[in-house]
């Protein structure tokens, strides 16, 4: 059983991480939020859950033990498969899940695509007394910075730039802020990244001087 992987990030796109461990590349399914915290060429460690089906073996990866436990508990709920469990973790972190279950707030789960009213109620019912958070709420400065850069990348993607271009611009903006001794907060990074991307066209945008199709 593969419980964790540590290696070099070869590529990350959407919900798929390709991690090289001692010359072997492993494809790992992760949440988009987790994917945005990973960088090509960097070292990464993921805790994993191997889901076995008749026609497939799929690795799901998580940044910490709380996410892994929440995923496995969700997969044990009637009507919740691994993809739906991953979708829940994209919208609710383990602490938010624990709070929703404790408050019997099934509406928090109904907001997740693919989770209907019946399944949401089952999640609350079947996870009662099982879900808890083992790590402290306070985040390190590094973790907070990763979240800020991930949020800026997401914002740029929403404005039409590709993930690759957005990542590069945000990394450059963060490096510039560090060189100048300035705080790398979201407004600053977004403003600087947009300034760097100014001359470029977002993916799918009409070329300069041409009207968009109507």
Curated annotation (Swiss-Prot):
Residues 139-143 are annotated as: Flexible linker. Keywords: Cytoplasm, DNA damage, DNA recombination, DNA repair, DNA-binding. It is found in: Cytoplasm. It comes from the Bacteria. One of its GO terms (cellular component) is cytoplasm. GO terms for molecular function: ATP binding; four-way junction DNA binding; four-way junction helicase activity. It holds the Pfam family HHH_5. Residues 1-63 are annotated as: Domain I. SUPFAM superfamilies: DNA helicase RuvA subunit, C-terminal domain (SSF46929), Nucleic acid-binding proteins (SSF50249), RuvA domain 2-like (SSF47781). Has three domains with a flexible linker between the domains II and III and assumes an 'L' shape. Domain III is highly mobile and contacts RuvB. NCBIfam families: ruvA. Belongs to the RuvA family. The RuvA-RuvB-RuvC complex processes Holliday junction (HJ) DNA during genetic recombination and DNA repair, while the RuvA-RuvB complex plays an important role in the rescue of blocked DNA replication forks via replication fork reversal (RFR). RuvA specifically binds to HJ cruciform DNA, conferring on it an open structure. The RuvB hexamer acts as an ATP-dependent pump, pulling dsDNA into and through the RuvAB complex. HJ branch migration allows RuvC to scan DNA until it finds its consensus sequence, where it cleaves and resolves the cruciform DNA. Homotetramer. Forms an RuvA(8)-RuvB(12)-Holliday junction (HJ) complex. HJ DNA is sandwiched between 2 RuvA tetramers; dsDNA enters through RuvA and exits via RuvB. An RuvB hexamer assembles on each DNA strand where it exits the tetramer. Each RuvB hexamer is contacted by two RuvA subunits (via domain III) on 2 adjacent RuvB subunits; this complex drives branch migration. In the full resolvosome a probable DNA-RuvA(4)-RuvB(12)-RuvC(2) complex forms which resolves the HJ. This is Holliday junction branch migration complex subunit RuvA. The lineage of its organism: Bacteria, Bacillati, Actinomycetota, Actinomycetes, Micrococcales.
